[in-house]
Amino acid sequence: MKKIVLAYSGGLDTSVILKWLQENYNCEVVVFTADIGQEDDMSVIQKKAAALNVKEIFIEDLKEEFVRDFVFPMFRANTIYEGYYLLGTSIARPLIAKRQIEIAHLTGADAVAHGATGKGNDQVRFEFGYYCCDPNIKVIAPWRQWELTSRHSLIEYARKNNINVPLDKVNEPPYSIDANLLHISYEGKSLEDPYVEPDYTMLSRSLTPELASSIPEYIEITFEQGDPIAINDISLSPANLLHQLNKIGGKHGIGIVDIVENRYIGIKSRGIYETPGGTILLHAHRAIESITLDRESAHLKDEIMPKYAKLIYNGYWWTTERKMLQSLIDKSQEKVNGTVRIKLYKGSVIVVGRKSNNSLYSYNLASFDSESQGYDHKDAEGFIKVNSLRLKKS
């Protein structure tokens, strides 16, 4: 191998991997860090890489691209995996993989490497992304190759090589954490027992509902063709809008979930997720769709959503079938315009109003107090008779 591009977070795992690659492949290692809203100090990450004698360091602000081209398209589908998971980690991997391959081409590297473990989904997501973008790229997955088979052995290797081991608030190695502008996830340690209540002091973006404000807050979100464009009539870029919703939702205890999910490779995994802004967006988007989509379009979207979510979760973002579904979803959003009013209170997102110039809602048809033109109550009798025929024969 001539040169390797490593997806580098600056954390314990990828710092150890960087050292291990240098020792075992005897070639130049380029590091790439995607700033997608994880709120790490990028200058510290650069110094860590430089201290390990890395000559080419790419640290790129991809927050706007991440939200505009990945998060928002996913939210047009009201995407949710297994009833709870808003796919915060899953949706970040295609962008990182794409840019990693682009940097490999730019620097003349013939291989890429990642820090995903051999038990997780991310190894699949990264490598599917690599091969979609460059079928001939060589892939190095250290967790499937080296003899460091546990967190303990990883920490020992780090200490022997003078690599800093971060500690949490109680002076222990922290949870396995993944963060971006959409969410923060926590795995490992005591969470591996699914019956143990989490220590919520781990949370960094949200207050728990018990500690959240006792005063409800009302906000309005404006949508244009299915994408949010403004909060309280203030237009914001995609990344800034999601960042602002995270701040608002976090102080009201919105979007904290405790999940046991089914990984693609067949293992069940427990995690704690903070997704305040995304949780608000999901409720708001469904609300604006409720008055702008006709019944059959809305029901069709609900039918295909689990398939779409599964494709993203399993790493198939760049595939033809995902793009086909995206085209259908995007077509449905052409008239999803308007404003949703929401009340936030102690972990709850309560839709209290919605309006749109494209609304299909008719007050005269819906009201119990008005006579509707074009609808006669007696018409329902024939409708019921025809649709009950098969029931009478069963």
From Swiss-Prot:
GO cellular-component term (any): cytoplasm
Record-annotated disulphide pairs: none
Annotated pathway: Amino-acid biosynthesis; L-arginine biosynthesis; L-arginine from L-ornithine and carbamoyl phosphate: step 2/3
Highest taxon of source: Bacteria
Enzyme Commission number(s): 6.3.4.5
Binding positions for L-aspartate per the UniProt entry: T117, N121, D122
Localisation per UniProt entry: Cytoplasm
Binding site for ATP: A7, Y8, S9, G10, G11, L12, D13, T14, S15, A34, G115
GO-annotated biological processes: argininosuccinate metabolic process; L-arginine biosynthetic process; urea cycle
Gene Ontology molecular functions: argininosuccinate synthase activity; ATP binding
Pfam families linked to this entry: Arginosuc_syn_C (PF20979), Arginosuc_synth (PF00764)
Assembly and oligomerization: Homotetramer.
UniProt protein name: Argininosuccinate synthase
Species: Ehrlichia ruminantium (strain Welgevonden)
